[in-house]
Regions:
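P-loop NTPase motor module signature
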Residues: 1-246
């Protein structure tokens, strides 16, 4: 089941997470998955939880003290060995602090409870500034539902959203497709290399903004990756369109 925060949804995120952790630990045994927008949020929350847990915190997943809790971070910049910690056996409760890599990319085993502040870093390209950014934004309803679905796979679970039901209902149903919000330079270059023809004529499920296509072609032309902005590239004798060696 998913619960939403009431009038205190604007309170400090870390405080809200700690309060939710206390509530879920009182609800029964089981591991907790907390979704956070980025590495810094994870590190700040990890430090706060370790301080809050005090002597109950253990670093190796072994229940040497009553009510022992392990806190495990999970984000893409961690080494493969560090990311693999979430799959290792443990004998105490575990709190996993993860980016949205745990939303769809992998399944963290043993999760019974989820805490969702409702935020994520969403890649966006600005047609005005020509810069790719990673702003923190509210997730869509579909993403929120996906997150809530990560709990209760081993037993009846609880998902706590740190935002109101009205906030949830006001969010877009789905996350905007990536092709509509990121730089198309790499897509255009790959299409040219594969000889797929003009980008403007390709039958995308979600056709990109013509301005984004022009920006991508202009960038690739300026750095010499393709030859002609008119059709994306000049075809060589081998039928390939992009410059570059093997």
């Amino acid at each position: 089941s998913a619960e939403s925060a009431g009038p205190q949804e604007d309170r400090d995120q870390v405080t809200g997470i700690i309060d939710a952790v206390n509530e879920l630990m009182a609800a029964g045994p089981g591991d907790i998955l907390v979704f956070l927008p980025g590495e810094r949020d994870i590190r700040d929350t990890e430090a706060a939880l370790v301080d809050h847990l005090g002597p109950r915190h253990v670093a190796d997943g072994r229940a040497r003290v009553p009510g022992a809790v392990e806190v495990v971070p999970l984000y893409s910049r961690l080494s493969a060995a560090e990311q693999h910690r979430v799959f290792e056996a443990h004998s105490c409760r575990r709190i996993v602090l993860a980016t949205n890599v745990a939303e769809t990319s992998l399944t963290v085993p043993g999760i019974r409870y989820v805490i969702d502040p409702g935020l994520a870093r969403i890649s966006r390209y600005s047609n005005r500034t020509k810069v790719q950014r990673l702003p923190i934004e509210p997730v869509s309803r579909a993403s929120a539902d996906q997150r809530a679905g990560r709990c209760g796979r081993v037993a009846d679970g609880i998902a706590i959203r740190l935002y109101s039901e009205a906030d949830y209902l006001a969010r877009p149903e789905y996350t905007e497709p990536e092709i509509l919000r990121t730089s198309l330079a790499s897509v255009i270059l790959q299409m040219a290399a594969l000889g797929l023809g003009a980008v403007e004529d390709f039958p995308f499920l979600d056709p990109p903004d013509p301005r984004a296509v022009r920006d991508g072609i202009t960038l690739l032309t300026e750095i010499g990756a393709i030859d002609r902005p008119s059709d994306g590239a000049r075809r060589g004798p081998n039928g390939r369109s992009a410059r570059g060696g093997r």
